[in-house]
């Protein structure tokens, strides 16, 4: 494969499918752990870091929206989601993009309390999304920022400044790579830019069909929270922010001609964060059962993953 950090290419490729963040970090892990791990295992170890940072972001945003004590519940719902379990081991840039989406959502959640810090977090999240998945994935962030303007508590000059600073931060991180790619390989640059296929109408129904199993057990709890709070959706940030974010992601996916269930991963974030509030609304016995179910599921899969990993290297 090509050694270029700017445009990492496999031997059979003449254009890039995605920006270089995920392969660059993966290659770094391969180099660091070359003496003890096979390349594909080293890259999967980088997945563990991406997902761990995503979990930290989920905990922070859930605490910001729901208060202390909810972060662990959101994390358990997230890691127990079937879609994550099926895709967490895959060597795909969607894994690193997930951290970007988590940071972006945390940035919006943090806005009212710490607007400047929130703008930095959002800008950094946007950068990770772009440098992992390209520009189309950013559409969901853009749509979310626009839909929030329909809510009175977001419609003020401070919010516009928040969006502006976030954009400046993101551009300052993204622009160097775009500039270097254009200058070093204009053919690859234009090939990548033009690699946008028109949707054919099947995308939306594909994702709706796969939504229930992919987001289980987050989706039922998310719906439960919406039903319980439907009168106050527009007053409660902890409800309307995850809802708008989810709708924006689904709309963006309907425009993505590359149909793949792994593209649903970002929607696990708002579902899990909102669902965390639903656990306290359940009866005490049901909430306790769900809590222990999440702990047991996480423990079981954690044991299985580490068991096979040790078996593979010994």
Regions found by a protein language model. Give the residues of each.
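Membrane-interface transmembrane helices that cradle and orient dolichyl/undecaprenyl
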Residues: 63-69, 104-121, 128-129, 279-282
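Specific aromatic-rich, kink-prone transmembrane helix
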Residues: 97-113, 125, 270-274
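Loop-to-helix entry region of an early transmembrane alpha helix in multi-pass inner-membrane enzymes
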Residues: 20-24, 33-53, 87, 91
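Transmembrane-helix motifs of polytopic, lipid-linked glycan transferases
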Residues: 45-65, 103
């Amino acid at each position: 494969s090509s050694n270029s950090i700017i445009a990492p290419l496999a031997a059979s490729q003449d254009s890039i499918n995605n920006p270089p963040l995920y392969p660059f970090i993966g290659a770094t892990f391969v180099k660091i752990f070359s003496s003890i791990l096979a390349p594909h295992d080293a890259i999967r170890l980088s997945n563990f870091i991406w997902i761990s940072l995503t979990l930290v972001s989920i905990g922070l945003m859930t605490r910001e929206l729901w208060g202390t004590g909810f972060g662990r519940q959101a994390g358990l719902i997230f890691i127990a989601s079937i879609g994550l379990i099926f895709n967490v081991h895959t060597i795909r840039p969607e894994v690193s993009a997930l951290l970007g989406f988590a940071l972006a959502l945390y940035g919006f959640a943090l806005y009212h309390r710490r607007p400047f810090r929130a703008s930095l977090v959002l800008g950094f999240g946007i950068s990770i999304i772009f440098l992992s998945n390209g520009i189309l994935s950013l559409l969901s962030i853009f749509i979310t920022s626009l839909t929030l303007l329909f809510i009175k508590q977001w419609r003020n000059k401070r919010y516009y400044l928040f969006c502006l600073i976030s954009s400046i931060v993101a551009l300052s991180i993204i622009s160097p790579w775009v500039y270097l790619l254009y200058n070093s390989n204009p053919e690859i640059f234009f090939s990548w830019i033009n690699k946008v296929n028109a949707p054919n109408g099947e995308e939306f129904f594909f994702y709706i069909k796969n939504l229930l199993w992919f987001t289980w057990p987050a989706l039922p709890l998310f719906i439960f929270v919406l039903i319980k709070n439907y009168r106050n959706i527009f007053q409660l940030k902890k409800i309307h922010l995850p809802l708008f974010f989810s709708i924006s992601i689904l709309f963006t996916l309907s425009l993505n001609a590359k149909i793949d269930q792994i593209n649903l991963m970002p929607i696990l974030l708002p579902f899990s964060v909102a669902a965390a509030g639903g656990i306290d609304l359940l009866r005490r016995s049901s909430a306790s059962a769900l809590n222990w179910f999440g702990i047991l599921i996480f423990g079981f899969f954690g044991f299985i993953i580490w068991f096979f990993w040790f078996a593979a290297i010994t």
